[in-house]
Amino acid sequence: MVRLGQVMYLHKDAYEEYAKRHAELWPEMKTALKKYGATNYSIFLNKLTGQTFAYLEVPDEATYNEIAETDICKKWWKYMEPLMDTNEDNSPVTTDLQEVFHLD
């Protein structure tokens, strides 16, 4: 299992709406996440900076990254775009983090 961590960047006035939309995650998006291997997925918010920290585990990154090509993922990105920093394709601007410690 591969452990992934990344930072994303929310707009200051979007914290509550971001949390609300994730609390109401579309069933189709949840199914896609699981289909492409995501497990133990959590997102944390730093209200002082607007940064989120996402953590998830996947069997392999290549399979998980294929989710970006699905219609449901692209629809979710468009839905979330007003709330966060995004790229031209509406995907969130992210910073991948390097794991430096793990304790089982």
Swiss-Prot record:
Pfam families reported in the protein's UniProt record: rhaM
Gene: rhaM
Function: Involved in the anomeric conversion of L-rhamnose.
Predominant location category: cytoplasm
Keyword Isomerase: yes
GO BP: rhamnose catabolic process
Organism for this UniProt entry: Lactiplantibacillus plantarum (strain ATCC BAA-793 / NCIMB 8826 / WCFS1)
Catalytic activity, as annotated: alpha-L-rhamnose = beta-L-rhamnose
Enzyme Commission designation: 5.1.3.32
Pathway: Carbohydrate metabolism; L-rhamnose metabolism
Protein family membership: Belongs to the rhamnose mutarotase family.
Catalytic site: H22 (proton donor)
Database matches in Gene3D superfamilies: 3.30.70.100
Molecular function GO terms recorded: L-rhamnose mutarotase activity
UniProt entry keywords in alphabetical sequence: Carbohydrate metabolism, Cytoplasm, Isomerase, Rhamnose metabolism
Gene Ontology cellular-component annotations: cytoplasm
Assembly: Homodimer.
Protein name: L-rhamnose mutarotase
